[in-house]
Amino acid sequence: MSAVFDASAFLATCSNRPGVYRMFDADAKLLYVGKAKSLKKRLASYFRKSGLAPKTAALVARIAQVETTITANETEALLLEQTLIKEWRPPYNILLRDDKSYPFVFLSSEDEYPRLSLHRGAKKRKGRYFGPYPSAGAIRESLNLLQKAFLVRQCEDSYFRNRTRPCLQYQIKRCKGPCVGLVSPEEYAEDVRHSVMFLEGRSNALADELNVGMEQAAMRLDFEKAAELRDQVAILRRVQDQQSMEGGNGDVDIVAAIVTPGGACVHLISVRGGRVLGSKNFFPQVAIEEEVGEVLLAFLGQYYLSHQERDLPAELIVNVTHEDFPVLVSAIAEARGRELEISYRVRGTRARWQQLAVTNAEQALGARLANRQHVAARFEALAEALDLAEPPQRLECFDISHSSGEATVASCVVFGPEGPLKSDYRRYNIEGVTAGDDYAAMHQALTRRFSRLKDGEGKMPDILLVDGGKGQLAMAQEVLQELAVAGLILLGVAKGVTRKPGLETLYLNDASHEFTLPADSPALHLIQQIRDEAHRFAITGHRARRGKARRTSTLEDVPGVGPKRRRDLLKHFGGLQELSRASIDELAKAPGISKKLAEQIYAVLHSE
């Protein structure tokens, strides 16, 4: 029992009514938020003299203050609890990683030839959003299928607008070539309509419609069209066999939770319109001993109550039950305006799906724990290689990515003994440096990172790993000296002459200590892993930034030149490069271009 908290005096005045309680430490830091049918009974269970699990006892030992809020009923208590957990993320609560955006399939509506794409973030563009999906992988699978079946374009708008001949997707029959007018807007619109039917889960109606169209095409002796529709039906049937859930066309989420001494995993399978959209593993943070039912209840509350944009199914199939599920159903109905059913005892196909979710959760948790042990062993090997008294707890690695100085991005990735700490990853858009100057880019990124540390933001790494050898290591040391940052180890890594993995040269601190590690060294494998992850994270950020900069064609800056006229101009001159070389008189000879408009186009193309 806490020495600084008088539990007896507190419990003597505690209410027996439903409500929410908040536990604080001596520094007024919120440790834990909970709800209870009876506040007094629930809180008394924490302060009994024996029988507490070790992690729960550790929580109780830190309690210096408890605050309670009485609610009208358990439903209000659950809603308030979820609000507080989302806002404060107390360290002893069961917490999900806070996904800030969810993936959707986006169909543009402003284009003559609409595009299908994966979308995250704010819904600013006009069009239809299908989802959210459980993972980006599930969306890519659907997009790949739609591209095979209906050939709706998925290329970037800038790429689409500047084509003068069909791309490879047309050659391999994944696109009908709308960029160069090889398909009419009417035929393309029909393909888009069929794609929408599929995304809406109306696969059976779509298959019926395609079958009718196939028969009609055959009667007209249009065997090419009939064969195309036949292939589309075959793809649909194959998908239905692979992704359908027998027993109806309902919207169901199958959720299974597994808890072991090493951690917890929740596996979710999402079914909409009888079609499996995909699945995802979640690894909630569990700081105190919890039964599997408590973990599942906490997951469902955070997953469906904390994010209103998530699609709500009609039914949940779960692998364990909990006495508070009726309260959860009531809370979801109040917050979302819709009721759902939670099923535990299911039979037949539904039971097989339930078991599949359990199996996936078990396998995912087992793989995660094995990887955690693997990474921890590598951290111990690194400590031995660097002659450290104990393994480091936080490694940060920086890398730079650009294309000939364009759209320079620096990345910072973070690893701990349990693996990548992706919520701590950061990217830095580099500005104001000479194009291609990696040293200046590294100086700017490190200055921004460690200036924030000096201001009390973020955590100090034990080891700072810099990809680039002596030069970048010297730059990192210069930044740390400028900011008076001390107490960390600097480690530079340079590729060998052949640039093959296993031949890296390592430099410690001021580069006075140069050494190598055996190719089979676990310590070297850890260094390679974090370096490669930093490179991956930098290059994906660079490509996104470069793509955004290139997405707008120069011609889009010309008033009066819309998508059709841009396409006609590019087709007339054979591409943007040839168009840029044209004189005003040559531009004015293009169909639909007046002398005044030609002058405007020329001015924009030669503004630099």
Swiss-Prot record:
Disulfide-linked positions: none
Cited PROSITE patterns: GIY_YIG, UVR, UVRC
UniProt subcellular location: Cytoplasm
Annotated protein name in UniProt: UvrABC system protein C
Coiled-coil boundaries: none
Pfam family, one: GIY-YIG
BP term (GO), one: nucleotide-excision repair
HAMAP family according to UniProt: UvrC (MF_00203)
Gene3D superfamilies named among the record's database cross-references: 5' to 3' exonuclease, C-terminal subdomain, GIY-YIG endonuclease, UVR domain, UvrC, RNAse H endonuclease domain
Physiological role: The UvrABC repair system catalyzes the recognition and processing of DNA lesions. UvrC both incises the 5' and 3' sides of the lesion. The N-terminal half is responsible for the 3' incision and the C-terminal half is responsible for the 5' incision.
InterPro entries from the UniProt entry: GIY-YIG_endonuc (IPR000305), GIY-YIG_endonuc_sf (IPR035901), GIY-YIG_UvrC_Cho (IPR047296), Hlx-hairpin-Hlx_DNA-bd_motif (IPR003583), RuvA_2-like (IPR010994), UVR_dom (IPR001943), UVR_dom_sf (IPR036876), UvrABC_protein_C (IPR050066)
GIY-YIG domain boundaries: 16-94
UniProt-listed SUPFAM superfamilies: C-terminal UvrC-binding domain of UvrB, GIY-YIG endonuclease, RuvA domain 2-like
UVR domain segment(s): 204-239
